[in-house]
Structures are given as C-alpha cells and as structure tokens.
C-alpha cells in the first residue's frame, strides 16, 4: 500500500527531477564528435537562413510578437511541442527508465498533466481576450497599469529562472555531447538565441521550434523502431529481456519509492501541473494563430506530440537497458556507463544507428536548447516592451517603432544577462531553478489568468494583493527552504522545511485574491464587476477579438 501511495505522489513530480537526473553531478567530457559538429552547423545554417527569410516578413509589431497571427493550428501545435520538450527531459527520462524501469513511465505521464487544463480552461478564452501577452487578458476589465506591472514582473522572474536552467543545461549538455568548453557553449547559445529573436521575431522562433520538434520526434521514433525491431516488435520480449539483464531484475517492472517527502512532492506537483498554464512563453504561442478554434487545435496537437514523445522515451529507456547495459563498449573500467546514466539515450543512438545517427541525436539535443531559449527570450522582451514600456510607462500611447526598438534592445540585454547568469550559476542545481520557475508561474501568473477569466467578482485590488502575495510567498519560502537557506547560505537548518513552496504560495494567492476582492466596495471595484459580462461574451464568442492574417 505504501508503494502505491508513493507512486501516486511521484506521478506529480514532473520535469524538474528528471532534469536533475540528466544534468546534475559531474559531467564527463566526451571526445569531439565530427558528425555532430557538421550536423549542428547544418542546423544553425538552415535556421539562420530562416531567420533572414523571417526578417523580410517581419514589418509590424503584430508580425514581431505573433508572426501576424498566420500560423496554423497544426504548425503551432508542433511549435508548442518544440517549445516544451527539453533536451534535459529527453535525456533525463531515458536515464530514469534505464536506471529504474517503470518509475520513468510515471514521470513521462507526469509531463502531460498540465495540458488538459490549458486545453479545456484557457486556450480559447486566452486567444479571444488577448492580443500579444497574457497580461492583455489579465488586465482586460481591470486597471491596466498595476495589473500589467504585476504580470510583467511575474513573467520576467519566470523567464529569468527558466533561462538560467536552460543556459546551464546547454553548457553541460554541449560539454557532454560535443566536447566543447562550458563557457564557449553558453556564449554560443546566447549569441544564436539573440540572432533568432532580434531579426526574425516570432516567425523565426516558430520555425526553429517546428524544425527542432520534427528532428526530435523523428530521431526518437527511429530509435524506438530500431529497439522494437531488435525484439521482433514484441513488448513482452522487450520487458522480459530487460528484466534478465538489469541489475535490479523484476523490480524494474513495479513502482518504487522515489519520493521521500509527500509535502514536497505535492508542492512540486502542483507547481508543475498549474505552472505550465502560467508559463509566458507557452501562453504567448496562442496569439500566433488566427482565432480561438485554431488555438484549441494547437493544444490538441501539442498534447498529442508531447504524449507521443514521452511514450517513445519509455521505449528508448528500456532499449538502453537491453542494448547498452550489457555492451562493454559503452562502459568505463569500473563498469559504469560512459558519461553517466544521462548518456543512455545517446549511447543507444550509437548502438542502433552508428556514429552518423549519434551525431544526429547530439545535434538534436543542441537544437532543442536553442528552440526553448528563443521562445523564452521573446516572451521576456514582449513583457518589457508591450506591458511595461507601451502600456505602463507610455500609458498606451507608444508608437510601433518605439515599442519594437525597446523590444529588440531588451532581447540583446536578455542575451547578455542569460550568458552571464549561465556562467555564474554553472554549478547550481537545474532542477531547483526549474521548480522555482514553475512555482512562481503557478503562484502568480496562473491564479491571475484563471480568476480574471472565470470569476465575476474579481477586482484590481484583489488581483494585485493576491498576485503579489503569491509571488512574494513563493520567493520567500524558496529562500527559507533547504536548497538556498542551508546549501547556498550555509545555515544549519532550513526555516521552511520543504523544497518547493507552491502548495502554500498558491493557496496564499487564491485566498488573497478572493478575500480582497469580495471586501472591495469601492466604485472602481463595482464597475470592474459590471464589466465581466461583456468580457464573458467576448471570451466565448470572439466578437471584437484581434484576427490573424490569412493562412
């Protein structure tokens, strides 16, 4: 019974722990892989050409932020999948399956938990009410300046933390796969992400994400097919043979006790489940399609692609047990896997496709990072230029040219900051950074979006107090928790005993928003409640919503 209890809880512990598997600990530098370098250069050359092509078609603010709303639902679904599937999760989940078997499947399923929330509760209404950023939705019937300031701050904190995790992950992965120096790798990723976003905007970012998704799905599909071919496409054979060669034997086919602390597990689970629906770079993608119908299609396709991908990682993990585990070519003198368990999928690529396919998978891992950081950079730049500069500082009176200039300056600044933080945080725990980013998205962005769309009694006062309460509670509890208070600051015991704060910070955000809204008897508050009806009609019908260009 206890095992079932822990396995149910571990269902919620999603990408962060899997990423920890992939990218924490000592990195074993690999020899220079010429095929990987060539394929990576081909990818970079191709995507830079796409950026040049996109720059010729990016003339207005709408083009820059949303690709003119001309992306189809299918294309956007692929791009969202490309934005969401990280290299760390690919290597991490494969490594987890390789080491623990069935437990890896729990993590794979966990990645999908947040997507039904976006599909059923958010996608259509977000597209009907917003134009460029989710702050357009949150501030639809509330006071523009305070709500946009809150939304932009929430976005920038999430983007900064997620960028740190991606840049550190980029450096470690490239050092691992290509044999390049960590600092060189971080600078290279920073320069490329700035080029994509600065010149190509959302159009270039979208196509980089689509190409990356196709490459990753194709590579993973080929690996899974080759694994299944080796067992005559029989799952019983795959699992029974894996049990025979794995050191843990039959226990890899049953759930284990991966989670030791139920409160931390539940807290991280809530963060990753609801945080997905508060990630600015994911939400921004819904404005790239023409209408709410295409937005709904986007999530439908994205969920399918992401779910399919994580099924493949499970097969890849078991394939690694079968084809990599017993093969001494992939082991060091001590009998451990070269590069650690996180290299299981990469070694499997070598086992099923030789050095050429190994080079392809290595290049795909790099492409994956570039796609994610490009999306994050654009989301951060739009929060500064559209929400802070145009709406707060200029009070909605900024012209397009000035707003775009501010956005592009922000892209350059974000690139420099990302490189600096990537180098500064080289030895920090990536899982912790990702968990914090999701915790803040779930504690600040998600409550404001969902309540503003569904609750007619929300007022600016309630949204502001609840949002800032959620944001500050998440940050304060994280600082007082074991990772920062003990590991980084060197105190003996943490004041807040759990790893992640979302269980408490989300409650603080929702309760604060509810209480300070229902006790708001001001004239402004009454007017904001009356405006809900017209907002509801537009959110359901799309009447008056901005339309994208023709496909």
From Swiss-Prot:
Question: Which topology term describes how it sits in the membrane?
Answer: Multi-pass membrane protein
The answer to whether the entry has keyword rRNA-binding is no
CDD domains tied to this protein: SLC5sbd_u4
Q: Where in the cell is it found?
A: Cell inner membrane
Superkingdom assignment: Bacteria
Any single GO molecular-function term of the entry would be:
acetate transmembrane transporter activity
- GO terms (BP aspect): plasma membrane acetate transport; sodium ion transport
Q: Pfam family example for this protein?
A: SSF
Q: Which GO terms describe its cellular component?
A: plasma membrane
In the record, the note on similarity to other proteins reads: Belongs to the sodium:solute symporter (SSF) (TC 2.A.21) family.
Q: What does this protein do?
A: Transports acetate.
Which HAMAP family does the UniProt record give? Acet_symport_ActP
**Name the record gives this protein:** Cation/acetate symporter ActP
Q: Which organism is it from?
A: Yersinia pestis (strain Pestoides F)
